[in-house]
Design a protein with these regions (language model features):
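FNR/FR-type flavoprotein reductase catalytic core
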Residues: 69-216
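Ferredoxin-reductase
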Residues: 2-79, 154-155
Length: 216
């Protein structure tokens, strides 16, 4: 089943990524962490919802990819434009557990964890990776919800922030700094990150449950 929604707002988070806000259809429900198919003018793409489950609007974290794809169109389309919205799907959703939940994200892969935080999930460890400081999206929200928030920047450009941010990849941080523990891991990001992190966790935490989702 498809729904018709309208673009109501676009907020740029840095030079490449923006949050797109759309109307929410009546009786449209989803679980924090799920994604939907958006389509416009023959272009189709899956995007993770970053709204809280009880919010009146639907929000999406989108990275603009230069060219003729959907993200480039959504970066410029007029407020009020109608989009087609598919039904929610995906299984990277929060599972209640007596273990400590560790969320690990790279880039816009932080999206499902934003939705979880906006839906009331708290007390997790979040290891958030980006190329530079501006790519650590939603930091105030996530720091407030997390037990521990760690920002990892692989290509730092501002040494003044060196004291509060880890310089390196999320895999480097987990390898060198994540203490032994009883964890559930949730991974979202690029396929290379998911591959490398899964291999690392299998070695370091063989009894841990690992939930993952890669974006293309």
């Amino acid at each position: 089943m498809e729904h018709l929604v309208q673009v109501s707002e676009r907020t740029w988070l840095d030079s490449e990524a923006f949050e797109l806000t759309c109307t929410r259809p009546q009786r449209f429900t989803f679980v924090a962490g799920q994604h939907v198919r958006l389509s416009y003018d023959g272009l189709v793409r899956e995007y993770t919802i970053v709204s809280g489950t009880d919010e009146s609007m639907l929000r999406f974290l989108i990275k603009r990819v230069p060219g003729s794809g959907l993200s480039a169109r959504l970066a410029e389309t007029a407020i009020g434009t109608s989009l087609n919205l598919g039904e929610p799907t995906g299984y990277l959703t929060f599972q209640s557990s007596d273990k400590i939940s560790v969320f690990i994200a790279s880039g816009v892969g932080v999206a499902p964890f934003v939705a979880m935080a906006r839906s009331g999930v708290q007390g997790f460890i979040l290891i958030q990776g980006a190329r530079n400081y501006s790519g650590l999206f939603y930091r105030p929200l996530l720091e407030g919800a997390a037990l521990t928030w760690v920002g990892c920047v692989s290509r730092p450009t501002d040494e003044r922030q060196a004291d509060s941010i880890f310089h390196g990849r999320v895999t480097d941080y987990v390898c060198d700094h994540l203490s032994p523990g009883n964890y559930d891991f949730y991974l979202c990001g690029s396929r290379p990150m998911i591959h490398d992190m899964t291999h690392l966790l299998d070695e370091r935490y063989p009894n841990a449950r690992v939930y993952s989702e890669a974006y293309s």
